[in-house]
Structures are given as C-alpha cells and as structure tokens.
Amino acid sequence: MSGIVTYGSYIPRYRIKPDEIARVWGENPDHIKNGIYILSKSVPAPDEDVATISVEAARNALKRKKIDPKEIGAIYVGSESHPYAVKPTATIVGSAIGVDFSLFAADYEFACKAGTAGMQNVKAMVDSGMIKYGLAIGADTSQGAPGDALEYSASAGGTAFIIGKDDTIAEINSTLSVASDTPDFWRREGQPYPSHGERFTGEPAYFRHVITAAKMMMERMETQPKDYDYVVFHQPNGKFPTRAAKMLGFEEKQYKDGLLTPYIGNTYSGSMMTGLSSILDVSKPGDHILAVSFGSGAGSDAFDITVTDRIEEMDRNRAPTIKKMLENVKWVDYAIYAKYKKKIIVGDGIE
C-alpha cells in the first residue's frame, strides 16, 4: 500500500503577535485573540516565498530519508501565492533538490487544499505504477489587506510529503473529496488581497465540507472518532478546527498535537499538512490518523492514515521538528512586518 515515505516542513522564524497588529488599528487585542484563538503568526522574510519555503520543506523531507531525488517522478506544489503567475514553482523545487529531467510537474490551485490535492494525485500515480516516488507540497505566504480581519491570521509556511510504496512510515488507507461552488473567499487575477463573503465562511463553507468529508471517510472505513489516535483539520483560525472536532465527537487529546494555528497562524495550503507533520513528529507505530483539509470555493480532502513500524527506524530529528521551529522565534513589530510583506510603497511605486 502506498503512503508517506518521508516528510518535512518549514516555518519562517519571524513572528508577530495580534496585540501588535491590534495596536496599530486601534482594536482590542483580547477580543481578537479570544475570537479567533491566535496568539501569534509567522511572517516570511523579504527573501522568502512559496518557492523557497517549498524547497526547504522538500530538503527537510530528504534529510529524514535518504532517497535518490532522481527516483522522484512527480512534483506538485499547491499554493494560492505562487511567486510567478507564469512559471511553475514545481520546476524550481525539482531543480533545487536534483530530480531527473523525466518528471511530471505542475503547480496546483484550490485555495487552501491545493497541497492535499497534490497528495491525492501523487498517491494515484504511485498506486498505478507510473512513478516510484512523488513529492506533494502545500505552501503559502498568504495575504491579508491592512486592517482586514485576515491580517491577524494570514501567515507563511509549508510541508512536503514524499509518497511511495517502499518503506512507508504512514500508510494512506483511503482518500476522498467533496466540492461545491461556494463563494466564501476569492481573489481575482491581479488583485493583491483576497475578499471574503463572511456569511458563507462558517457553516456553508468550512463546516459543511469538513464535517461531511470526515463523516464520509469514517463511514467508508467503518470507524468512529474513538478509533483514531489523532485528528487534524484545516486551520483558518484556532476556533474552527476545535469546533469541528467537537461536533464530530473527538476529544482534545486527539487534536491538540496537530493544532498549530494558535502559534503560527493560517499557512493556507500548508495548514492541514503541517498539522499532520506535527503529528508524525510524535506518533508511534499503529497510530490511526484522520486528516481533513479545506479549500475555499469550496472543497475538502479526507485521508485515513495508519502509522507503520518504520516510523521508529526514522531519525525524525535529522530535520527540524515542528516543536523546534515553534521555539525558533524572532519577534517583529508592525513596521517590520509591513516592510517584509511589502505593504509599504514609497516613491513612484518602488517597494
């Protein structure tokens, strides 16, 4: 059975607190923190984008497992903030890690679930025998307009999974998807910041798709919440995934290890995948995981995963764990944040 052979993540070390953002806009920081349960968020440095984050995540995956990059037959990078409108991030990653010229490569877009769509495609290609290994990445440097509610959550980070049949540390037992035309969140071509239809954000979009996908997976696998050691959902904020977990009947001990948004914000395409990476950092053989992503527009991908004995053979500390990246912090104020995010335009448009 195909599954995750190795994994790696990257989270920028710069962080800003909602208190600092609220100070600039005259908001009540306690109201913000209690409302969305975000205590800090990651900020990309001026030289960091989806390409560099993807490369770092992929390199961290290769540090944990010595795989010949030339045996990677496909690379798919999911993001809604690719650095180029026309020029694939996937080929940049491939060149940086040394893959072969014979390669399936593409950039994916489906809001925050583009990375998990890549996981599904890579798994299908491995299962069919088209490739030996495939690399699926979810990464973003997400945007929020100055003063907008998204500015408190939109952050940066990403995760890479190499999927194959040999030496899997976590078998992907099954995957499924749901999708509908739901106008909860969008950004038109050329616009720097997204718009959101607030009344569609909760029940019609996130909860409808995440809850339905999770229930469909449990029905397919004939499982119940108590059968899982861990559960991880897409995390637009700290409140939505905890509410979804409780609605489905999961307990805090099952979702706490994958809940990262309170500390790094919403990494969009990297969100659920980075939560899963955090779980793999601490999981043991036999652990059963339910993972459900969400992308605005809208859809969800669900995965039923079982950790194998090979997880103990892997030296997970060969690459930075999520815990280590959470501890590696450099705080910035709003001025530095605005500068790094290119929100300050000077002169005749020179950033």
Swiss-Prot record:
Function (record text): Catalyzes the condensation of acetyl-CoA with acetoacetyl-CoA to form 3-hydroxy-3-methylglutaryl-CoA (HMG-CoA). Functions in the mevalonate (MVA) pathway leading to isopentenyl diphosphate (IPP), a key precursor for the biosynthesis of isoprenoid compounds that are building blocks of archaeal membrane lipids.
Keywords, ordered alphabetically: Acyltransferase, Isoprene biosynthesis, Transferase
Positions of transmembrane segments: none
NCBIfam families in the cross-refs: HMG_CoA_syn_Arc, PRK04262.1
Keyword Acyltransferase appears in the UniProt entry: yes
Pathway terms, separated by semicolons: Metabolic intermediate biosynthesis; (R)-mevalonate biosynthesis; (R)-mevalonate from acetyl-CoA: step 2/3
Protein name: Hydroxymethylglutaryl-CoA synthase
Chain residues that bind (3S)-3-hydroxy-3-methylglutaryl-CoA: 112, 153, 201, 234, 243, 266, 296
SUPFAM superfamilies for this protein: Thiolase-like (SSF53901)
InterPro entries assigned to the protein according to its UniProt record, in alphabetical order: ACP_syn_III_C, HMG_CoA_Synthase, Thiolase-like
Record text on subunit structure and interactions: Interacts with acetoacetyl-CoA thiolase that catalyzes the precedent step in the pathway and with a DUF35 protein. The acetoacetyl-CoA thiolase/HMG-CoA synthase complex channels the intermediate via a fused CoA-binding site, which allows for efficient coupling of the endergonic thiolase reaction with the exergonic HMGCS reaction.
GO molecular function, one term: hydroxymethylglutaryl-CoA synthase activity
CDD domains recorded: init_cond_enzymes
One Pfam entry name: ACP_syn_III_C
Residues annotated as binding CoA: 199, 239
Catalytic activity, as annotated: acetoacetyl-CoA + acetyl-CoA + H2O = (3S)-3-hydroxy-3-methylglutaryl-CoA + CoA + H(+)
Keyword Transferase: yes
Homology family: Belongs to the thiolase-like superfamily. Archaeal HMG-CoA synthase family.
Active site: 80 (proton donor/acceptor), 112 (acyl-thioester intermediate), 234 (proton donor/acceptor)
Species name: Thermoplasma acidophilum (strain ATCC 25905 / DSM 1728 / JCM 9062 / NBRC 15155 / AMRC-C165)
GO biological process, one term: isopentenyl diphosphate biosynthetic process, mevalonate pathway
